[in-house]
Amino acid sequence: MHCPFCGANDTKVIDSRLVAEGEQVRRRRECLACGERFTTFETAELVMPRLIKTDGSRQPFDEEKLRAGMQRALEKRPVSVERLEAALVHIKHKLRATGEREVKSLVVGELVMTELQKLDEVAYIRFASVYRRFQDLNEFREEIDRLAREPAKQ
């Protein structure tokens, strides 16, 4: 690895540790030319499947769009950023685990609803109302009644 201070090619690893729940390797390095120390982080580059929209068009997976949609549903709800990020990691893991190059956007929507239901039922109802295009109060009631009948998902 090139030294960010002097540009030399020769660096040695002093220390390596797993971070981010084993998803990253943190390495402390030292330049053999100038002696400066610096930290690098390694993550596996995993390709997310492309999404097939309901109209048949295809687009790349957009983590920021997913995060924004979940944040909108969780707005003013008592859910930490850490729990949201963990839910995002879980959704991405499930999508990669399909082994498919393309997945229907409906699959992503269902995964989001499952994770939101675990995080906060109000956020789940908010998201479901938009995602499933609730037309009237009866549809809200039916979904709330269904939630009330289910055992808590944690």
Swiss-Prot record:
Its cofactor is Zn(2+). Disulfide bonds: none annotated. Keywords: ATP-binding, DNA-binding, Metal-binding, Nucleotide-binding, Repressor, Transcription, Transcription regulation, Zinc, Zinc-finger. GO terms for biological process: negative regulation of DNA-templated transcription. One of its GO terms (molecular function) is DNA binding. Residues 49-139 form the ATP-cone domain. The keyword Signal does not apply. It comes from the Bacteria. A zinc finger (unnamed) spans 3-34. Binds 1 zinc ion. InterPro entries: ATP-cone_dom, NrdR-like_N, RNR_NrdR-like. Pfam families: ATP-cone, Zn_ribbon_NrdR. The keyword Nucleotide-binding applies. NCBIfam families: transcriptional regulator NrdR (TIGR00244). Belongs to the NrdR family. Negatively regulates transcription of bacterial ribonucleotide reductase nrd genes and operons by binding to NrdR-boxes. This is Transcriptional repressor NrdR. The lineage of its organism: Bacteria, Pseudomonadati, Pseudomonadota, Gammaproteobacteria, Pseudomonadales.
